[in-house]
Amino acid sequence: MTNLHRDLAPISAAAWAEIEEEASRTFKRHVAGRRVVDVEGPSGDDLAAIPLGHQVPINPLADGVIAHARQSQPVIELRVPFTVSRQAIDDVERGAKDSDWQPVKDAAKQIAFAEDRAIFEGYPAASITGVRASGSNPELKLPIDAKDYPEAISQAITSLRLAGVNGPYSLLLNADAFTAINETSDHGYPIREHLRRVLDGEIIWAPAIDGAFLLSTRGGDYELHLGQDLSIGYLSHDANSVELYFQESMTFLMYTSEAVVSLA
């Protein structure tokens, strides 16, 4: 038995398989950060902190003794509870192919958003600064009209190149901006294709973020550290429902402030 206590859940292997498949599909669809940053791990449930390689002086224990404290980044645990009906679970054993897993999808989306918000917008309580606040390049304005996106992205690419940051460069767009580039054309040519001509990386739907980010994906500039990768655990059950939860442990570090341009 692990700390997830799944063995205690009144859920068959077939139902677990459906829940996990739906969870994985939904999480991967909504999460964006893992597609552009280096992912380290999962390193195990016991990962508590990431050493930063720096130290700071502290008050000595006695005269003539020099003391330093080594710095580290704490790993945080994210958890999102959700409830599924026992009827949906039992229907799988009866051969149903359409059990209602909407609570699974809603919770998977919620934890995907939480992870991406921590990466891109930061999480001060967890000592995570985030990509936006860590970036040293001037923030650019994301145009109101999608027809002006290619020019803005070209400016962002120029900023990265002038800062000595090589590509490939990937573009993350919030849901509205992503929809706009797919629905807008300029002289009959889709804006998405205009952007593909100036980018050598991916154009990624990132519904959790505000605005957009252009990032280098050359590697080595930012790291998402995972202790426990996204997992499903068991909390309790009654005659009608089973309470489960998504859980992961993570932290995020950015090493190269020049490797990103944010657009808002």
Curated annotation (Swiss-Prot):
- InterPro entries to which the protein is assigned, alphabetical: ENCAP, Encapsulin_nc
Q: Name one Pfam family in it.
A: Linocin_M18
Q: Which domain of life is it from?
A: Bacteria
Q: For this UniProt entry, what is the primary localization, expressed as one broad class?
A: other
Q: Which UniProt keywords apply?
A: Encapsulin nanocompartment
The cellular location(s) given in this protein's UniProt record come to: Encapsulin nanocompartment
Keyword Protein transport included in the entry's annotation:
no
What industrial or biotechnological use does the UniProt record describe for it?
Foreign proteins can be targeted to ectopic nanocompartments in E.coli upon coexpression with a construct using the 38 C-terminal residues of DypB (AC C0ZVK5), tested with GFP and luciferase. Probably only one molecule of each foreign protein is inside the nanocompartment due to its small interior space.
Q: Thermal profile, per the record?
A: Stable as a monodisperse organelle up to 50 degrees Celsius, at higher temperatures they aggregate.
Question: What are the disulfide bonds?
Answer: none
Q: Which GO terms describe its cellular component?
A: encapsulin nanocompartment
* Function according to Swiss-Prot or TrEMBL: Shell component of a type 1 encapsulin nanocompartment. Assembles into proteinaceous shells 21-24 nm in diameter. Empty organelles can be expressed in E.coli. Cargo proteins (DypB) are targeted to the interior via their C-terminal extensions.
UniProt xrefs under PANTHER family: PEPTIDASE U56 FAMILY, TYPE 1 ENCAPSULIN SHELL PROTEIN
Q: Which family does it belong to?
A: Belongs to the encapsulin family. Family 1 subfamily.
Tell me the subunit arrangement: Forms hollow shells composed of 60 subunits. Monomers probably form pentamers which assemble into the shell. There are 12 pores where the pentamers meet as well as 3-fold axis channels and dimer channels; none are larger than 3-4 Angstroms in diameter. The N-terminus of the protein is inside the shell, the C-terminus is outside.
**Descriptive protein name:** Type 1 encapsulin shell protein
Name the source organism: Rhodococcus erythropolis (strain PR4 / NBRC 100887)
Report which gene this protein is encoded by.
Answer: enc
